[in-house]
C-alpha cells in the first residue's frame, strides 16, 4: 500500500511539472485531508531545513515527506482537542525562527525569507509548522512532566567532580529509533549503520529517527560533557570525530550519537548554569520519549484512510 501511494505521488508531482498539478487526496485522517500538494510542500520544507536530503532519490524523499506530514496532521488534530486555538506568542515565534535560520548560517529574518523564497516557501508556512511543534511539546510537558525522573543531586555531584578550568564540549547528532523486541536491536542497528554508510548520518536520521531533530538531520548542537549522563558520556568519550556510537538503550528508545566535533573551553565551569543545562538536556530527552509514546497512542485511535 505504501509503495503504491509513493508511486502515485511521484507520478502526480513529477509527471506534471510543466502543467498545473492536479490536487489529489492522498490521506484522510479523522476527516482531515492530506493532498499531494501538502506532501510536495513538506518535501520542499524538509529540504530547506536539511539540504543533504537532496542527495537521496526523489522517491525516498517523498516517503520521508509523506510520513512527516502525517505526523504533523495527527499532532494538529490532537492539539485542537487540547487548545482553544493553535497559536503562539509572536515573540516566542521570533525566537524559534531565529534558532532555525541561525543553524542555516543566516544572519537575519530577511535573509531567511529570501532563502525560503528560493524553495518556494513563505515565512507564514514555517510559522504554522513551528507553532504545531511548539504546542505539541507543551502538550507533552503538561501530560508527562510528573513522570520525569531527573536526579538533580547526582547531576550536580558529577558537575562538581569535573569543576575544572578546561571544559570539554561535543558537537553531536542523534538518531533515536524503536524496536518491538529487545532482540531486534542489533538487526535494526545494523540496518541503520548500512544506511549511514550509504547515504550519510543526516539522511539516515531523516529516515529512521523519531526525534524532532530528524527534520534537521539529527543535529542537537554543542553539548557540554557534564550535561550528559555517565552512560552517554562513556560512549562518546570512546569515539573519534566522525564516528558514531553503538546502540545506547534508553527507557523508551534506542539512541545512536555521532561525534561531529569536540572542543575544549578554557573557562571555569559555572556550576548553576551547567546544572540548569544538564537538567534541561535530561528532561528533554525523557520528554522526547514520552512524545513518541503519546503519538503512537493517539494514532491508533484515529480513523485513517490512505
Segments predicted by a language model, with ranges:
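Peptidyl-prolyl cis-trans isomerase
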Residues: 56-306
Amino acid at each position: 500500500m505504501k509503495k503504491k501511494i509513493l508511486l502515485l505521488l511521484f507520478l502526480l508531482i513529477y509527471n506534471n511539472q510543466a502543467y498545473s498539478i492536479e490536487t489529489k487526496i492522498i490521506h484522510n485522517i479523522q476527516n482531515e485531508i492530506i493532498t499531494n500538494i501538502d506532501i510536495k510542500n513538506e518535501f520542499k520544507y524538509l529540504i530547506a531545513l536539511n539540504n543533504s536530503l537532496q542527495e537521496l532519490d526523489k522517491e525516498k524523499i517523498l516517503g520521508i515527506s509523506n510520513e512527516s506530514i502525517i505526523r504533523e496532521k495527527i499532532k494538529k488534530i490532537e492539539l485542537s482537542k487540547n487548545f482553544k486555538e493553535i497559536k503562539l506568542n509572536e515573540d516566542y515565534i521570533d525566537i524559534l525562527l531565529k534558532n532555525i535560520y541561525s543553524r542555516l548560517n543566516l544572519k537575519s529574518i530577511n535573509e531567511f525569507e529570501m532563502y525560503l523564497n528560493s524553495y518556494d516557501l513563505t515565512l507564514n508556512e514555517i510559522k504554522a509548522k513551528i507553532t504545531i511543534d511548539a504546542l505539541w511539546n507543551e502538550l507533552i510537558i503538561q501530560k508527562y512532566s510528573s513522570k520525569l525522573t531527573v536526579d538533580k543531586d547526582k547531576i550536580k555531584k558529577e558537575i562538581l567532580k569535573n569543576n575544572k578550568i578546561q571544559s570539554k564540549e561535543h558537537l553531536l547528532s542523534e538518531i533515536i529509533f524503536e524496536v518491538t523486541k529487545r532482540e531486534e536491536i542489533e538487526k535494526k542497528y545494523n540496518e541503520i549503520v548500512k544506511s549511514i554508510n550509504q547515504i550519510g548520518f543526516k539522511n539516515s536520521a531523516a529516515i529512521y529517527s523519531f526525534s524532532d531533530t530528524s527534520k534537521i538531520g539529527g543535529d542537537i548542537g554543542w553539548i557540554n560533557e557534564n550535561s550528559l549522563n555517565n552512560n552517554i558520556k562513556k560512549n562518546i568519550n570512546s569515539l573519534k570525530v566522525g564516528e558514531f556510537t553503538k546502540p545506547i538503550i534508553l527507557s523508551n528508545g534506542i539512541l545512536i550519537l555521532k561525534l561531529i566535533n569536540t572542543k575544549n573551553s578554557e573557562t571555569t565551569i559555572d556550576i548553576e548554569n551547567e546544572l540548569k543545562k544538564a537538567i534541561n538536556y535530561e528532561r528533554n530527552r525523557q520528554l522526547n520519549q514520552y512524545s513518541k509514546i503519546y503519538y503512537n497512542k493517539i494514532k491508533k485511535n484515529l480513523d485513517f484512510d490512505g
